[in-house]
């Protein structure tokens, strides 16, 4: 993984060959200044208010995120979340082939979650891939992440059996609802990557027991009403 997380892309570029595939996490800050950057397969998992202290308006933030595909052609692919209003609208303008995923409804084409099973649909014909109980991740948002990853690999022609086996073996990465330990019957999770209200809400929603939430950080000109509302029925104590 290179880019905004992992190693610097410039360093890894020294070791790539013609058929190399790199996974790049690109921030809105980096996308502001791209010129020739052209990912064969791009993905936008969701767009929610963030970094408004930098971009000032939601419109400017969305424009920066969408620029990831500005150099794509009809030979390229863009993986988008059908349940996000911004990405669904953007799908009508994307220059490449759009691959949808959905955690809430069946799709004619794309990947979707239905009754704890993830499916791949082509022209209305759906193939069951696996039950989410076979994965090691928590939360609906992680099922969306899984579907996006499957779509990306599928676009590159990776055999589906290999994709599914990798999904089942994958464990949460650090700082993302990362299981830490169980002490005296209490499970501890590190979700410090939840640095905006939407990400923090998804972490709370993934918890299936009464939760003590420890939070901190600095204000990025976000609104916190929905985040606080998500405490209801989930968070029994908040430590700030």
Regions found by a protein language model. Name each.
Residues 97-99, 187, 237:
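Conserved beta-strand segments of alpha/beta enzyme cores
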Residues 4, 103, 216-218:
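Cofactor-binding loop segments of dinucleotide-utilizing enzymes, especially the Rossmann-like FAD-
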Residues 2, 95-113, 164-168, 178:
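Beta-strand->loop->alpha-helix junctions that form or flank phosphate-binding loops
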Residues 1-8, 26:
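Short beta-strand-centered segment that lines the nucleotide-binding/catalytic pocket of NTP-utilizing
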